[in-house]
A protein has these predicted regions:
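Small-residue-rich segments of transmembrane alpha-helices in multi-pass membrane proteins
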Residues: 1, 117-131, 175-184
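Generic multipass alpha-helical transmembrane bundles of integral membrane proteins
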Residues: 1-115, 128-134
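Transmembrane alpha-helical segments of integral membrane proteins
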Residues: 149-163
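Juxtamembrane boundary at the C-terminal end of a transmembrane helix
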Residues: 186-192
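Interfacial loop-to-transmembrane junctions
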Residues: 161-180
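Loop-to-transmembrane alpha-helix initiation sites
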Residues: 2-13, 135-147, 170-175
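Active/binding-pocket-proximal capping segment
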Residues: 117-123, 141-150
Length: 192
């Protein structure tokens, strides 16, 4: 049963990070690029604003529902993965919630931001508390890791006021690393 939850958590976390692209492809909002001189200088075709608005609303609604579903799935799986005999379940939860939190940088609507950040923050805090309780031998390294992550987050978001290209690249690299770590961690948690 634990193997199913580990696999489902990994798939949900990976799907959660691919949701914007999936919803954009379902919304079918496209740009027609001109390929010849005649197409460049031709008058543009009229745009049906009502259809574009409806497609945007459809894609945005699907994205919101998807984010809520992924957050709910991860929050339900978190106590089950923390109760495993190996601390890899807690690491999977932390990495999945951290990837969700880093993915929230690309959210532009308030309701999606509230859902994603609050679910990721709640998941990180609850995972930390539960893993310290279930695996007390890892309490000090986990606490130090979480403090370092919190310090880095505060420095990159509040101390450097201007948008820093370095901070953006570091966050992109951290998000990519989290996504890439999920399958090997799930494999190790299943096999150990």
């Amino acid at each position: 049963m634990a193997n199913i939850w580990i696999s489902a958590t990994m798939v949900a976390a990976l799907a959660g990070n691919a949701l914007p692209w999936m919803c954009l492809s379902f919304a079918r909002i496209s740009v027609q690029s001109p390929h010849s001189d005649a197409e460049i200088f031709a008058l543009p075709e009229p745009i049906d604003y009502a259809e574009v608005k409806q497609r945007y609303i459809t894609g945005s609604t699907m994205l919101f529902i998807g984010r809520v579903s992924v957050a709910t799935m991860l929050l339900i799986a978190m106590p089950l993965l923390n109760s495993l005999s190996t601390p890899l379940g807690a690491v999977i939860c932390l990495v999945a919630f951290l990837a969700m939190l880093l993915d929230s940088r690309q959210i532009h609507t308030l309701r999606e931001m509230c859902v994603t950040v609050s679910a990721a923050g709640l998941g990180i805090i609850c995972t930390g508390l539960m893993s310290v309780r279930m695996h007390p031998e890892f309490s000090i390294p986990l606490t130090m890791l979480m403090l370092c992550c919190a310090l880095a987050t505060i420095v990159f978001t509040h101390v450097t006021r201007r948008r820093s290209l370095f901070a953006t690249r570091m966050a992109d690299a951290a998000e990519t690393l989290c996504i890439m770590m999920l399958p090997p961690l799930a494999y190790l948690a299943i096999t150990l």
